[in-house]
UniProtKB/Swiss-Prot annotation:
Gene3D superfamilies, per database record: 3.30.390.30, FAD/NAD(P)-binding domain (3.50.50.60), Glutaredoxin (3.40.30.10)
Annotated tissue distribution: Expressed in intestine, pharynx, seam cells, hypodermis, rectal epithelial cells, neurons in the nerve ring and amphid sheath cells.
Name the UniProt record assigns to this protein: Thioredoxin reductase 1
Lineage, opening ranks: Eukaryota, Metazoa, Ecdysozoa, Nematoda, Chromadorea
SS bond list: C219-C224
Effect of U666C: Loss of activity
Knocked-out gene: effects: No obvious phenotype. RNAi-mediated knockdown of gsr-1 in mutants lacking trxr-1 causes an arrest during larval molting characterized by a partial detachment of the old cuticle and an impaired ability to reduce cuticle components. Also results in growth arrest during the postdauer molt.
Enzyme Commission number: 1.8.1.9
Active-site residues, record numbering mapped to chain: H639
Amino acid sequence: MKSLTELFGCFKRQPRQQEASSPANPHVSDTLSMGVAASGMPPPKRPAPAESPTLPGETLVDAPGIPLKEALKEAANSKIVIFYNSSDEEKQLVEFETYLNSLKEPADAEKPLEIPEIKKLQVSRASQKVIQYLTLHTSWPLMYIKGNAVGGLKELKALKQDYLKEWLRDHTYDLIVIGGGSGGLAAAKEASRLGKKVACLDFVKPSPQGTSWGLGGTCVNVGCIPKKLMHQASLLGHSIHDAKKYGWKLPEGKVEHQWNHLRDSVQDHIASLNWGYRVQLREKTVTYINSYGEFTGPFEISATNKKKKVEKLTADRFLISTGLRPKYPEIPGVKEYTITSDDLFQLPYSPGKTLCVGASYVSLECAGFLHGFGFDVTVMVRSILLRGFDQDMAERIRKHMIAYGMKFEAGVPTRIEQIDEKTDEKAGKYRVFWPKKNEETGEMQEVSEEYNTILMAIGREAVTDDVGLTTIGVERAKSKKVLGRREQSTTIPWVYAIGDVLEGTPELTPVAIQAGRVLMRRIFDGANELTEYDQIPTTVFTPLEYGCCGLSEEDAMMKYGKDNIIIYHNVFNPLEYTISERMDKDHCYLKMICLRNEEEKVVGFHILTPNAGEVTQGFGIALKLAAKKADFDRLIGIHPTVAENFTTLTLEKKEGDEELQASGCUG
């Protein structure tokens, strides 16, 4: 990738500074899509600008005009700033000033509006490119109001005058965060650290089954944290069976899992995290309000608590970080008789025979650990598994889960009927109906099966309908997610969004956390850094974990052409599985996707193995640094580990090849 020097031609470096890099196309918007888990989202189909313009320790020689760093600081800390290049633009500057002065109100008005000082800052054309790249505004001269990029005169005039007048007044808070998930909390604490007055609103509407939870969002309460703990509990069950092969003498009798004990342990841990977040907010002097926030004006929020008491709050800026909630299909009986991942981890009874509906990572992960506890589990899918992920890897996961003892049904439920009602001590019993092709006649016929628990995991949707975004004109996509110019609303410049609720953004907890912190530094401290939304390592915590980073086979071929892609792969056998004779050993697999005409630059890697997340995280940095296959070849592996297989790949994947067989230690 090109460096910023190559891209903008404006920087002179002090000696021995690290070379930074920039996106291949700085004009491509990174705007927008388990709030969710640090696992399970495919790499984005259209990567955002990949590299931050931040150059640590950089000296910017930028004349004429003030240095870029100073200019951005002024924009962040002044009420009104206009950036321009030359005296040729002075006429436009006068037009800005004239328009703003037209908003003045008479001195005898109830709250007379005074127009603050308008700072006109001259910057070089090179700095102009950087500022426009940071804001994704093409207009010039470019105006900032209270640290928010507005755009040019056209964009300024497009704002309602009443909104603009109110924007220039003082408000109670510098920032109100709506949503107390991982991203919202990170942003609130970072803004407070930068000296801003911050409030954070968080309120969880109960699921149709009545489940709610505390501060921390999806990941902590009903996503990655409880999911990973239950995944680990499932793996421990297999380790107990393996222990005999390793010489451990176990008590006679059947080893059984106790659902209630695990559930209570998981919920105790979550409760400690909920309390910890409240303590952190207090220590950071962030005002925590356990109320549901809704816009009632451009700079006003109505905060309604569980007692229906309403409090009005005002702020200069707002951050939407409300995340996602599970979707429910319009099928008779679904909302009455099914649960989602919102309910599973607090389920008061043992799930029993379970149907997981959906091909998402949530469905497969939950199916995996429930089967590991000894439950009869079926996964019902409409079409392909793990849409958006590498489909070769998805098929390998399906084959492993079938070998593991799970069942797969192709279809979609048409209705669900209750047979026995559930209680707090016992699961109910339900009959699920769906159409299935008769193998003898070829005709579709209705079939049914009884289950104790039905888990719906068909996808998630943004929590934006009841936040009042339409009241103030925040533009949303068809997905209900906020459309943004980076994290800034495309239509209301004092409203921002991060995390799962931002269109086009990977739905991953670490992404939301980093986006929140980086955004706060940019708008409150003038930092010239951006969140990098590409080449994000991720893991699906199925029984045999799937880790990946970069492009799938399908996306690599679509982007670069089939003839320019070379794929190295192998099947391997973890040493730990040899003595225990695990069936998993024939399913462990990895591959590396490279570009033929770019010295075999690595554009994606995928691995199906125990502890795939730990392996993927480490190798992810190689893609960020544009590593080539030869770099992996030169790296000496740690023996015996599964990770060392990335350093010994020699087999090229070709169409028509027979399935690989694992052999020897670690491959």
